Amino acid sequence: MRPFGTVATAMLLAASAIGIAGPTPTARAYTKEEVAINGTYRVTSIGNWAKYNEQYNGEPTTVQTWTLSSTCTTYQECDGTVKSDEGWSARLYMLDGTSWYARHEVPNWEHCQDGTAFTGKQTFSFYPVDPDGSGYLQLGSPVMAGRNKTVGPSGACGQNQWLTIDMPMRLDKIG
């Protein structure tokens, strides 16, 4: 006697092979121009879901306005610039056809009890998602989801550990 899971899997595979399970989605080809992201975005880093050294810890929610400008050499490789209304700018790039990255340094990010301060390295990673909130990848979407992660240097403030704050973020195209 076969386990139910094996029989169910065989039936599903057979149904898919003969088309009973319904039509398969059609593939859509994207051009490099459709993959590039350009425009003005509201960027919200969601503080109440922040992790402080891998432990959930409420941080303030932050909102920035970014101007993104990019061009792509292929549908998988893109390069550009992000300019924040907070006064910084950084390289914007994508190497895999879906995920975008921007990195910059945050001066005086980690403050110590003795009055010294250390620079943090902030990395933003994000990808376009279905605007309905499902979280599914959707190239060309005006909504993006991702992470905002800042890491301080090991040894700062007398601690042999990096201070790391990681929080989810959302980008909404506003112009």
Which functions belong to the PLM regions below?
Residues 1-29:
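Secretory targeting and sorting signals
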Residues 2, 16, 31-35, 48, ...:
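Extracytoplasmic/secretory-pathway segments with low complexity and glycosylation-like composition
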Residues 31-56, 82, 144-149, 171:
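Tryptophan-anchored aromatic micro-motifs
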Residues 37, 64, 165-167:
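Residues that flank catalytic or metal-binding motifs in active/ligand-binding sites
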Residues 48-57, 110-117, 152-162:
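Flexible, membrane-facing loop/turn or short amphipathic-helix motifs
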Residues 59-130:
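Predominantly extracellular/secreted and cell-surface proteins with exposed
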Residues 120-155:
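Internal, hydrophobic beta-strand segments that form the core of beta-sheet-rich folds
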Residues 145-175:
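Edge beta-strand at a domain terminus
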